[in-house]
Amino acid sequence: MAEKKTDYASLKKGGFMRQKQKGYFSLRLQVVGGNLTAENIRVVSEVADEYGKGYVHMTSRQGIEIPFIRFEDIEEVKAKLASGGVKPGVCGPRVRTVTACQGAAGCPSGCIDTYELAKELDAHYFGRELPHKFKFGVTGCQNNCLKAEENDLGIKGGMIVNYKEEDCIQCGVCVKA
């Protein structure tokens, strides 16, 4: 009986990247806008302990990777993560997970709701196949902490100030805008 050949391209498309150690994969997770719930973090920790080597790697794009997942554990890992609301990310020539700063939800300078926008972009575009990988980034204000220009499409929040001298309290917002 012929041995079943492993489809590495499909695994990579689903966020599983081959490691240099034979039979092991690093799983990239979908972390939209850099936000995870406490439950998401718990299940990621459990998977890293049970199926990996007890740690995760934080990527430069607000992502998480769980290294040292054995090939034979991949389906169990996906099921366990799904039970905690965590989805695998993607690799290769696809739209990647959308990154975002805290925006108006928590940052004093935030002009837009970056997380809601990141979720919308992710819902419409995540995982779409393209000729090359494609990255979205959403930053909430002109401080540009997310470095919008370093993405293929960066969105930067801003405001239009309606200056009325009689209402001015010298807050400085119009100077920053």
Range-by-range predicted roles:
Residues 1-22, 39:
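Intrinsically disordered, low-complexity polar/charged tails and linkers
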Residues 2, 27-161, 167:
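Small-residue-enriched alpha-helical segments and adjacent helix-cap loops
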Residues 169-177:
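Iron-sulfur cluster-binding cysteine motifs and their immediate structural context
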